[in-house]
């Protein structure tokens, strides 16, 4: 008797969860982000200017996208295998990141998507050498990469 009682109770609970009122969740929040037209290089570098054009993209709100200030497209393969050419990165604007974090950088007028190594920018693809900073280099961080959009 006890097993049959438990089975019936579980069956009733399962039916209740599938009722239409169980699916009356709030609509998912849509966020609008700037997608900058110039790609951050995952390779040898491309120019990035503060007056770069952008388009707007809509993304579903979630804990990651809600922290993003803008998006930017990857160009190149130096961050393979984790990041591919054409991936759209979600970026939280900041001018400082910790060693080991991924970021968008400008070094001497060229933009990069790399891992920050303190005195260098590091590619994830071992076929690419580190970019070591010299005394006269002009380095700026535009933001921390916090995720990417699924294709």
Where are these regions (language model features)?
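Short, hydrophobic/aromatic-rich beta-strand segments within well-structured domains
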Residues: 20-22, 89-91, 102-105
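Glycine- and charge-enriched low-complexity intrinsically disordered segments
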Residues: 118-151
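Short, positionally conserved secondary-structure boundary motifs
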Residues: 3-85, 99, 110, 134-135, ...
